[in-house]
Amino acid sequence: RCVCTRGFC
């Protein structure tokens, strides 16, 4: 899955 963290996916 895609998890967007710290400004990126």
UniProtKB/Swiss-Prot annotation:
Cysteines engaged in disulfide bonds, as pairs:
4-9
Crosslink position(s): Cyclopeptide (Arg-Cys) (interchain with C-9 in subunit B): 1
For biological process, the GO terms are:
defense response to bacterium; defense response to fungus; killing of cells of another organism
- UniProt keywords, alphabetically: Antibiotic, Antimicrobial, Defensin, Disulfide bond, Fungicide
Cross-link (Cyclopeptide (Cys-Arg) (interchain with R-1 in subunit A)), chain numbering: 9
Q: Renumbered to this chain, where is the cross-link Cyclopeptide (Arg-Cys) (interchain with C-9 in subunit A)?
A: 1
Cross-link named Cyclopeptide (Cys-Arg) (interchain with R-1 in subunit B), sites? 9
**PTM comment:** Forms a cyclic peptide with subunit A (PhTD-3) or with subunit B (PhTD-1). An additional intersubunit disulfide bond is formed.
- Function of the protein: PhTD-1 and PhTD-3 have antimicrobial activity. In low salt conditions PhTD-1 has antibacterial activity against the Gram-negative bacterium E.coli ML35p (MIC=1.5 uM), the Gram-positive bacteria L.monocytogenes EGD (MIC=1.6 uM) and methicillin-resistant S.aureus ATCC 33591 (MIC=2.5 uM), and the fungus C.albicans 820 (MIC=1.6 uM). At high physiological salt concentrations the antimicrobial activity of PhTD-1 decreases slightly: E.coli ML35p (MIC=2.0 uM), L.monocytogenes EGD (MIC=1.7 uM), S.aureus ATCC 33591 (MIC=3.6 uM), and C.albicans 820 (MIC=6.5 uM).
The entry's family comment says: Belongs to the alpha-defensin family. Theta subfamily.
Q: How does it assemble?
A: PhTD-1 is a cyclic heterodimer composed of subunits A and B; disulfide-linked. PhTD-3 is a cyclic homodimer composed of two subunits A; disulfide-linked.
Protein's name according to its UniProt entry:
Theta defensin subunit A
Species name: Papio hamadryas (Hamadryas baboon)
